[in-house]
Amino acid sequence: SVEERRLVAETVVRHAAGRVPVFVHVGAWNLRDTVELAKHAAEIGADGIAVVTPAFFSVRDQGLVDYFTTVAKSVPQDFPVYLYAIPQCAVNDISPKAAEECSRLCPNIVGIKYSYPDMTRIQQMLRINGGQFSVLVGPDHLFAAVSAMGGDGVVSGNAQIIPAYYKKIWQLLQEKNYEEAA
């Protein structure tokens, strides 16, 4: 429920206590709940939000742009918003053109978590805003490759279980030791 999600977000932000950035996923089954969760995340001191595409019914690019910009405009202009595409689960994919339009219309839309293993599309996302659009991947096996191409990392469930492994990969990537990182 929205109330449960609000409570989880409050608990995480409180316990993180500024030690690590907290981005709250606010995507919901409808725009009203998504906007409510986005505003709540900003109010409780989260560092930003991620918003998944609408699920179930297919939406054209303009519908996605309208959806994401509505959410982004509901929070302060300096509050970072990440788009989140996982088309294999949520039906809708975000085209690079739509992502770039979202970022143009709302400068607080700063990046995307792209969770589909389409390297061509990821390369296109990396070129948005002259390469200043943050690109995170979801599939763990793309972490090193996309980071080597200029991506900003991975959002990984596995990293919660074996963080030392992912920290080591990140350190190797920062050292540009791509062979060992892979």
Residue ranges of model-derived segments:
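Catalytic alpha/beta core domains of metabolic enzymes, predominantly
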Residues: 73-79, 86-182
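Active-site beta->alpha loop and helix N-cap motifs at the rims of alpha/beta catalytic domains
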Residues: 1-91
